[in-house]
């Protein structure tokens, strides 16, 4: 899935990317033109936002294709690498061009399908944009020397209107996607398929971690003391299996270790959504949890903790409704991308080379 279409999951993705990245190029007015696609003008701001998506995608693609390369090593430079026989920079440029074409395709598809963003959603997006431009931000002040992120974007080629249109385009992507694959859509994904994806990829757990370390943070080596800790953990598991609420046992442990944490009152406050691909705290731990019976507490003996763990059926909570969009995107995101990119196959494209050069991948990376 290209980065521009990953905004199906959250139209604020590009905002998050830009907030955590440092733009280094000199600014240009929001009215600067990056080019035209199907006769539609692409402002520099829209081009830059799509380029940031492309840069993120290129980094992800490189890591996927080169899992043994330490990209965090001192002196590592993505722009000295190649992807699929292309320079990293050229790869980003190609993705950027496609992202811009996808942007236009989304606009055209949205109109042709007769869709509309409801006023509440539009107001929420506009409020977020206005807040970005008007709310003072200490991070922006400390790191970028400006009062607001809006001022920061303006200095670096992304005007308020471009930012707004980019966010609205993300919402349009989401609405198109849901009109095809969501409830009542032309290619509605069956509930059984969604549930199957959830149960294969996620589970819910709660745990209490009984530390094997002393107050100084050193691992306890005394077997008698370790045995006491294990007995404590097993006692908690027995209480849970005997019908005591998990939250009550958890609070009991907090008192035992004289922890001043806020007392847990709701059971689901302790829920953890665990991905099958997770490696925290270890791959062995995750594999063990996925093999557990539902609602039966067990003690897992790890290097530094005795974990009192309970696994729960993810389909019994509210998670299915809460994360349904994630499941749909994982199941049908690539198909959606193919559909959109097919729309762009014969698009006429003309980029302003001066603008493209000014906002090169190297300049924003």
Regions found by a protein language model. Name each.
Residues 2-13:
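Bacterial N-terminal signal peptides that target proteins for export
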Residues 20-27:
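C-terminal motif of bacterial Sec signal peptides marking the signal peptidase cleavage site
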Residues 29-155:
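N-terminal targeting/tethering segments
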Residues 30, 38-44, 247-249, 254, ...:
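Cross-family detector of peptidyl-prolyl cis-trans isomerase
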Residues 33, 37, 82-97, 106-116, ...:
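Second-shell loop/turn segments in exported
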Residues 51, 58, 100, 104, ...:
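Sec/Tat-exported extracytoplasmic proteins
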Residues 148-228, 278-365:
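PPIase-associated folding chaperone regions across multiple families
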Residues 232-283:
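Peptidyl-prolyl cis-trans isomerase
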